[in-house]
């Protein structure tokens, strides 16, 4: 791993972060708290610490980067929502299970098997308090009214409801069955019904109303939502403030007697882009930019809560995104903003813009300030890293695709490089990354939202895509035909990984 020193030019808020002496060992006998904040569709180029030309103010994330470590080669296991969330919590690629492409929906059944180990369940066995607050998007077990124990009159639902659910029964198994002591959030993305807040296994308010779909896909730059069931008091604009309030409240309740793990998957800046009034006009990238700025403020509130509770010094705080930004090509010249930096593509794509994500780590007790790592990491690595922090190894059968990056964080020993990393697009297109090389077999397109999505190889031409990311990080030159040995090696390794499912 190559470490690059950078002089901080970002103003650090009134002593918010503590500088750490380079190379000094600060092993604490007390298990650290772990807070994992995962934004939804946040791009690498949105953050000022990655992109000096960003049109969006991100002072809190920039301060975290300056007070800790910034990774430049971090990846989500998928280029879309649900499979990345599966990978984060299980340390396992989602395509090894039943989700081979696409995402879950608001009424999808639980994607993670209750018996499977998760980061939360493993940390719970180590004495941690655990919570998930925010966007779930991994499904619940939803009781069907056809198998109800109560009279239908007890549940008010729209007529001819296509997914009749008895909300008087527990929505279980769900997050609580996967190791989380506490859950508060929404079932899926902010544009997917049912629009309802769930606390542990019950909705706060029954989704007895209906909302119409938004009028335009990119209404004044504000994105869209689908029509469907909703709680009568549900407002899309309230979601980010509400989940932030719950996350801060949960942190405030931690008394220091036990370490805690907070998984905080934000619902933003995924569409619809609905910044509250105080953030409108703060950025120069439309409502999207304003929503990102609001997300940055949310992260600042979490840091403040950690600091006020005396937790910040011994908390491993990670800020990242579930995939690349959904920043379409036309938005780049319109706003002169590159949400995915110079990387090709966007959310959902197999190209780098789909899965190369921001990744910031702050832990004053162990991580030196103002450091940058170019080690390749994947969000599936959270499980192995969290256990490594505690001096524990992965249990048999757990975290199949998880590798610890603790050595990269602490710089106490030379980190072991990831042998290979598998990428996966929304339509199920695979890619394999090994060192500088990235291979995409069988498709000459994006496999996602960018055109062309699918381009089948032609006779006499390349059978896929091969890029050297060191010399060509923007994936502009396909060198498949010039490197047959590398193609063969990577295809063999990918096939071996897939057979390991």
Question: Residue ranges of each PLM-predicted region?
Answer:
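Formylglycine-dependent sulfatase
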Residues: 2-3, 7-8, 15-465, 473-500
């Amino acid at each position: 791993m190559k470490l690059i020193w950078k002089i901080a030019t970002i103003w650090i808020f009134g002593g918010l972060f503590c500088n750490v002496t380079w190379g000094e060992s600060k092993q604490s006998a007390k298990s650290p708290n772990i807070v994992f904040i995962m934004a939804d569709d946040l791009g690498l180029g949105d953050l000022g610490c990655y992109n000096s030309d960003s049109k969006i103010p991100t002072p809190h994330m920039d301060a975290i980067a300056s007070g800790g470590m910034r990774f430049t080669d971090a990846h989500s296991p998928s280029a879309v929502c649900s499979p990345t969330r599966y990978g984060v919590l299980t340390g396992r690629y989602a395509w090894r299970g039943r989700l081979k492409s696409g995402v879950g929906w608001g009424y999808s059944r639980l994607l993670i098997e209750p018996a499977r180990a998760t980061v939360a369940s493993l940390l719970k066995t180590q004495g941690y308090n655990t919570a998930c607050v925010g966007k779930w998007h991994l499904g619940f077990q939803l009781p069907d009214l056809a198998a109800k124990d109560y009279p239908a009159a007890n549940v008010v639902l729209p007529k001819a409801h296509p997914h009749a659910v008895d909300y008087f029964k527990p929505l279980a198994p769900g997050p609580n069955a996967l190791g989380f002591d506490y859950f508060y959030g929404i079932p899926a993305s902010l544009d997917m019904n049912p629009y309802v807040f769930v606390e542990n296994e019950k909705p706060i308010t029954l989704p007895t109303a209906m909302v119409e779909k938004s009028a335009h896909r990119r209404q004044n730059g504000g994105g869209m939502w689908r029509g469907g069931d909703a709680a009568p008091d549900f407002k899309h604009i309230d979601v980010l403030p509400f989940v932030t309030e719950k996350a801060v409240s949960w942190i405030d309740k931690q008394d220091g007697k036990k370490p805690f793990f907070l998984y905080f998957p934000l619902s933003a800046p995924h569409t619809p882009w609905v910044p509250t009034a105080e953030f409108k006009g703060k950025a120069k990238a439309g409502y999207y930019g304003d929503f990102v700025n609001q997300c940055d403020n949310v992260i600042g509130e979490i840091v403040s809560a950690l600091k006020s509770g005396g937790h910040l010094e011994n908390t491993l705080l990670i800020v990242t995104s579930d995939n690349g930004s959904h920043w379409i090509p036309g938005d780049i010249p319109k706003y002169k903003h590159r949400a995915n930096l110079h990387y090709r593509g966007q959310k959902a794509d197999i190209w780098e813009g789909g899965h190369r994500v921001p990744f910031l780590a702050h832990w004053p007790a162990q991580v030196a300030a103002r450091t940058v790592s170019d080690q390749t990491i994947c969000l599936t690595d959270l499980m192995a890293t969290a256990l490594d922090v505690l001096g524990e190894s992965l249990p048999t059968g757990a975290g199949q695709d998880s590798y610890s990056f603790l050595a990269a964080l602490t710089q106490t020993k030379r980190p072991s490089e990831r042998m290979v990393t598998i990428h996966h697009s929304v339509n199920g297109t695979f890619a394999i990354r090994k060192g500088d090389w990235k291979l995409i077999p069988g498709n000459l397109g994006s496999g996602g939202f960018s055109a062309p999505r699918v381009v089948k190889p032609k006779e006499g031409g390349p059978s896929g895509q091969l890029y050297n990311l060191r010399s060509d990080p923007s994936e502009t030159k396909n060198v498949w035909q010039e490197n047959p040995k590398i193609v063969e090696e990577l295809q063999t390794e990918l096939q071996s990984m897939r057979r390991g499912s």
